[in-house]
Amino acid sequence: MALNDFHVSEPYTLGIELEMQVINPPGYDLSQDSSTLIDAVKPQLTAGEIKHDITESMLEMATGVCRDIDQAAAQLSAMQHVILQAASEHHLGICGGGTHPFQKWQRQEVCDNERYQRTLENFGYLIQQATVFGQHVHVGCANGDDAIYLLHGLSHFVPHFIALSAASPYMQGADTRFACARLNIFSAFPDNGPMPWVSNWQEFAGLFRRLSYTTMIDSIKDLHWDIRPSPAFGTVEVRVMDTPLTLDHAINMAGLIQATAHWLLTERPFKPQEQDYLLYKFNRFQACRYGLEGVLTDAYTGDRRRLADDTLRLLDNVTPSARKLGADSAIDALRLQVKKGGNEAQYMREFIADGGSLIGLVQKHCEIWAGQ
């Protein structure tokens, strides 16, 4: 199958997708009513899109093309308002978090959508288990070769993005001991983790053609790499973040990725090499398991450094780019988060340690998303 030409888009423009949990009070398990909400809110939208994801307990909010994080925040805030209003009318709740802490995957209903039904046929129960919730950020690129360079550059910071956004410590009623357990769900998929090595867009087109020979790949959307190019949009899409508990944190993560993209494409601080990925999965695991307390290992020197310290260094490097893009507030907020030493997974564990229940935790998450 031939790959679409890379659509030229304005560099550093943004698109944000948030996969939200649809909750059924008072038990606060996942609901199977996303279709009801989507039908209710679609006529009210003036920008962005609200749509299905894999199962009926998932609802995706997606912005249009945004020039900066302020425009993205305005679109998401408007969508949040209409979704919360419709959810209240249907006696449902909405919340963030990378996993629901006690849902049973066997109960999840795959959406009546041709693509998702085909995916269910290919992957079986793995698709129901993939009822987890992530944030995806698209960044615009001028051409395909820039997109491949940006993908490799951003891959250096996958552990940092995971650690800052980690919000999935509980699954199936148990503490997983991971800060981000969500990404483990995808480990059985054949396209899990980093994209196979290519050095330019022409090589990527050849890779896609060979992948399509498997008959499991009909489009880029069927590839679930941590970071992937999206030629139809003219973007690179970062897919490793848990859905945050607040809209503010989602915007901060998008601002970081936008600023990092600007720094990478203007400064070109790396010359991508295949060996860059030698310890990729080990460093990714450290971020998933330990969050900001994880330890990164340099594939070339063997040097080890705390993820928190390296994240502060990243934030310093991208600060000038953030100022140019109007994203400096995001960098300031994330710097404060790192210095305080926490993420949302840590907050969740503190809630339980203080005597809270998992049901109470989901209730609290719904209240947080509703601004209560």
Curated annotation (Swiss-Prot):
The protein's Enzyme Commission number: 6.3.2.2
A biological process from GO: modified amino acid biosynthetic process
UniProt keyword ATP-binding, yes or no: yes
Catalytic activity, reaction form: L-cysteine + L-glutamate + ATP = gamma-L-glutamyl-L-cysteine + ADP + phosphate + H(+)
GO molecular function, one term: ATP binding
Keywords: ATP-binding, Ligase, Nucleotide-binding
Keyword Heme: no
Record InterPro entries: GCL_type2/YbdK_subfam, GCS2, Gln_synth/guanido_kin_cat_dom, YbdK
Oligomeric form and interacting partners: Homodimer.
Biological function: ATP-dependent carboxylate-amine ligase which exhibits weak glutamate--cysteine ligase activity.
Family: Belongs to the glutamate--cysteine ligase type 2 family. YbdK subfamily.
UniProt-recorded name of the protein: Putative glutamate--cysteine ligase 2
